[in-house]
């Protein structure tokens, strides 16, 4: 065998061994860091997902965030392996706007959006000129207007994409409601200064509110269910498949039945 051919074969062998070792290392990943937000989201993971992953031999670290911005940047930068706090519309819009290569891997439950008040008990009590605190991020603001339209409080112009509704897209606001956009985490605190607040379920719960205390709760469409997300390059990794499987398990359904009644769920968890 010639010197050149021998070295070529050795090079191919070394590359093959290196690739195999790399794949083995990827498959052997046993530490997972998952980001989420305070309140119900971290509790859902702690009670329903973390135990299943630990039973499979993973060491799981849950990292809590107080906003909807940091978890995706932390995931894209490699500080997290996965996150669970957002619906797929928010994920896609955020990833596109910030040029992040992220992908959803499975749907999960969500504490529904709710209309809350310390002053009033029903939608019928909404008065003219009432001040309503609303989420300031575009996707959840659009979701809020669709929610309020269910009760005839506003109406969007014909042909407007319901996923992109803004205040400028409202054709009707019969009670001349005044909307106060705030960071989602601040909405519970706004209850003392406004007539109503439209609050994402996880932040309502983390602030001590109960879903049963809401003046009204959203009938959550499937596209607003939360998703677990990873970097796109990792979405088919064995550990990502294990995360997805945990969200689809009977164990998880039983946890939701016992500890999280009233949550909107994917069909597989009904």
Where are these regions (language model features)?
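N-terminal export leaders
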Residues: 5-9
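Immediate post-signal peptide segment of exported/extracytoplasmic ligand-binding proteins
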Residues: 23-33, 54, 123-129
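Short, polar/charged alpha-helical segment
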Residues: 38-61
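Short helix-initiation/N-cap motifs at beta->coil->alpha
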Residues: 62-73, 160-189
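Pocket-flanking alpha-helical
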Residues: 68-99, 114-116, 121, 141-144, ...
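Ligand-binding "clamshell"
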Residues: 93-105, 120, 193, 198, ...
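A conserved helix-loop-strand patch within extracytoplasmic ligand-binding domains
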Residues: 105-155, 253
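A bilobed periplasmic-binding-protein/Venus flytrap-type ligand-binding module shared by bacterial periplasmic
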Residues: 112-123, 225-237
């Amino acid at each position: 065998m010639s010197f050149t051919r021998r070295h070529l074969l050795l090079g191919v062998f070394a590359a093959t061994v290196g690739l195999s070792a790399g794949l083995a290392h990827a498959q052997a990943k046993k530490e997972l860091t998952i980001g989420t937000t305070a309140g119900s989201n971290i509790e859902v993971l702690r009670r329903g997902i973390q135990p299943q992953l630990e039973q499979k031999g993973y060491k799981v670290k849950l990292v809590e965030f107080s906003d909807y911005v940091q978890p995706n940047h932390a995931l894209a930068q490699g500080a997290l392996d996965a996150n669970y706090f957002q619906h797929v519309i928010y994920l896609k819009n955020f990833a596109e706007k910030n040029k992040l290569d992220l992908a959803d891997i499975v749907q999960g439950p969500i504490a529904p959006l709710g209309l809350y008040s310390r002053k009033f008990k029903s939608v019928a009590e909404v008065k003219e000129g009432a001040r309503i605190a609303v989420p300031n991020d575009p996707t959840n603001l659009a979701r809020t207007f669709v929610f309020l339209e269910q009760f005839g409080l506003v109406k969007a112009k014909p042909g407007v994409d319901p996923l992109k509704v803004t205040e400028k897209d409202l054709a009707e606001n019969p009670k001349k409601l005044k909307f106060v956009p705030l960071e989602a985490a601040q909405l519970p605190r706004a209850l003392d200064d406004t007539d109503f607040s439209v609050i994402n379920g996880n932040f309502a719960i983390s602030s001590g509110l109960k879903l049963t205390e809401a003046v009204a709760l959203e009938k959550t469409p499937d596209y607003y269910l939360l998703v677990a997300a990873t970097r796109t390059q990792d979405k088919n990794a064995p550990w990502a498949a294990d995360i997805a499987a945990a969200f689809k398990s009977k164990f998880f359904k039983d946890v939701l039945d016992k500890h999280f009644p009233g949550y909107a769920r994917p069909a597989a968890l009904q």
